[in-house]
Curated annotation (Swiss-Prot):
This is Probable DNA ligase. Its cofactor is Mg(2+). GO terms for biological process: cell division; DNA recombination; DNA repair; DNA replication. DNA ligase that seals nicks in double-stranded DNA during DNA replication, DNA recombination and DNA repair. It comes from Kineococcus radiotolerans (strain ATCC BAA-149 / DSM 14245 / SRS30216). PANTHER family: DNA LIGASE 1/3 FAMILY MEMBER, DNA LIGASE-RELATED. ATP binds at residues 212, 219, 234, 263, 296, 368, 374. The active site is at residue 214. Keywords: ATP-binding, Cell cycle, Cell division, DNA damage, DNA recombination, DNA repair, DNA replication, Ligase, Magnesium, Metal-binding, Nucleotide-binding. Pfam families: DNA_ligase_A_C (PF04679), DNA_ligase_A_M (PF01068), DNA_ligase_A_N (PF04675). Belongs to the ATP-dependent DNA ligase family. HAMAP family: DNA_ligase.
Amino acid sequence: MLLADVVATSTAVAATRSRTAKVAAIAGLLRGLDPADAELTAVVAAYLGGSLRQRRTGLGGRSLSGLPAPAGEASLEVAEVDRRFEEVAALSGPGSAGRRAAAVADLFARATGEEQRWLRGVVAGELRQGALDALVQDAAAAVAGVPGPDVRRAAMLAGSTVQAVVAALRGGAAELAGFGLHVGRPLLPMLAASTTSVAEAVAGFAGPVAVDTKLDGIRIQVHRGPEGVRIATRTLEDITARLPEVVEVVRELPARAFVLDGEALVLDGSGRPKAFQDTASRTAQASGDAVVPYFFDVLHLDGADLLDVALRERLAALDGFVPPRWRTPRLVTADPAAAAEFAAQALAGGHEGVVVKDLDSPYAAGRRGGAWVKVKPVHTLDLVVLAVERGSGRRAGWLSNVHLGARDPATGGFVMLGKTFKGMTDETLAWQTARFRELQTGEDGYVVTVRPEQVVEVAFDGLQRSTRYPGGVALRFARVVRYREDKTAAEADTLETVLALAR
């Protein structure tokens, strides 16, 4: 199969908002595969989901700059592209950077313009084509003639959409039924929907709910079985060797085999959580500040799989063998006022907020459903647009990703805090494209620089330390609320205001 076929499908998926049309486009490509060719099926499934099979390639922004002119005709095969990235990922030692750059240049020289744009996006992890794993799973179900939930459950248990797609196309329902929970093999974690109101979250369920403190750490999934302890991140990366203190905690728990879901974070001397970056930095290595685990769910316990058991029963099992000091703080209540007070206490303690959970719900891994609802405070700032990037896929022809800056009275200029393409309707995209063309002062490839005059109200979940931006901080999960035509750049929020939020 040609890479051009994958790129064309990705482009078609990105060009529509219809979920049905997206699934149909992906299914059309999957039908062209030989189900017996598991290797090619796996690569195509990964590419349709917007990722490479290689977790790390060593490629960054510099590696993708100054690339050769595109080829005039499509000739790259999917299997060859995967093989090239496998070779690049294996490079190490003295001179590897040069060999990596040469290999990438050779690959890109054989790619057309559309293929180069797609390759840049997938390497950088910024491929905005709308083909999320859930769509690929549904497309595989349609091609294989099996229920969508069967593919989704197999993906959950395997910890891999790619494996589930290969199984569905090759063996249908029979092969999908062979997937099960195995202690020691990470599975996809359950995700939460979002709201800004604790009362609204509680009112969405009948009867009492579990209200968990939302800790600002890294998600961990802990497996203990005959082969020992294994710790995986939300993305299923094995970090066991980096968290020896967590391994010791798990070894002391009074059970033979189990799978726990939780968070790990670094605390300061007073017991308050340190900044997320401190936890992220510590969990990237095997030494440093102690990492403390907090567990909020159990998926398997001594031979019994608990995925399909109601949360209230899973919590009872969790409380039965995990001491309170290692459990996420929790309140069970049907009273919105009590839940709101618990959330206020969590925020006062330096935590992110709370997660409200349906006590009757099973563990629906890998899906952001309504059984769990996270509630976090939302901050807004009035910032100035410094530049904007040309859109791709469905946003081709528009100016999309805006670069955001805070006012710096000390210099009279602006300090960049991040960028976002979130929160934009088609009307917003059309308006901002016209507006920023009016303000344009230059253009370098995909980035259009503009006069710093347009104020935009931006919502975000918090701030994080950053060495990328001169202010030392960056916005977390920023999205556009509205453009403030009633404000001038001189009225935008200052860097001092932003830094005060970080303290």
